[in-house]
Amino acid sequence: MEFIDKYFRESKEIIDNLDKKQIKKMVDYLVNLRKNSGRLFILGVGGGAGHASHAVNDFRKICGIESYCPTDNVSELTARVNDEGWNTSYVNWLKGSNLIEKDLILVFSVGGGNLEKEISVNIV
């Protein structure tokens, strides 16, 4: 039980420290996106790519928001990596998606990326 109690305490502490204003701001962005028929592009690498792919399903099915993820099309993504390089694969995929002003980009990242250390440079 000690582990479970510790887990619950730590989870509560994290939840208590979430910025409610920022969460509300994100909700407002998503509500406006749906109202204006914008598209949501969700990016992630590693585990974040799996979360991005699953989030596309939830936003489409539950929220009625047109959503896309570059890692859902492995053929296109790997062709871009092969032809253009990993560092520009996502930005070029986004360019090919013809983003417009009413669209949004959501990025799942654990480390946030770092150009100097070459960590998740394709999402920076």
Residues covered by each model-derived region:
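A short alpha-helix capping/helix-coil boundary motif
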Residues: 7-10, 35, 101-103
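Glycine-rich phosphate-binding loops that contact phosphosugars or nucleotide phosphates
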Residues: 45-124
